[in-house]
């Protein structure tokens, strides 16, 4: 399984990845996401394999040997690159390509989109809710993460601060910044995503934008309020029994 993409993209596709487990099972992902894949026999970063060099320069023999050793390769990597698909075909590598993102005009939730892609290849049925196991006791604090991968998806910071003042009457509030987020005074910043997941799993409440960290909080079972602006929650909202979504506009 080769799954590029940001934090949220990986998390939304976890049910599809897990449904394909059979025999020996490797998952190749973006380096930062590797610690979030807990179910594979082996997890590798795409960069460490040399796959990103395939089609650009002569690939290392170890990469071709590794790819040739698999009976099947399910890839969201290179799906929109005809030259990459042609190259792996010429090498007789057993690739099955799938689009990495749902269509822009689509209405199907992203997790269902990924599950639907692999349905004919599934070794088992899968829970359509992304889950990352974290055995962490719940504590009495709220987390606010005011960032995302795009400024247009961010609820204004002053409104988050106003919300925090209200929440502080009920419980302590801790601010959170992800590994790629800008500086924020007093924010907890944990670079390892699984360790960040464990910290989020201890929160009584999480509030954030349409972001990978919001998907991470939902996947560990923390009660989540996800604030959506221009993106479509019907496609991109986090899933889980403890997730609530609110829409905002400026």
Identify the residue ranges that each predicted region occupies:
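Catalytic machinery of carbohydrate-active enzymes
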Residues: 1-250
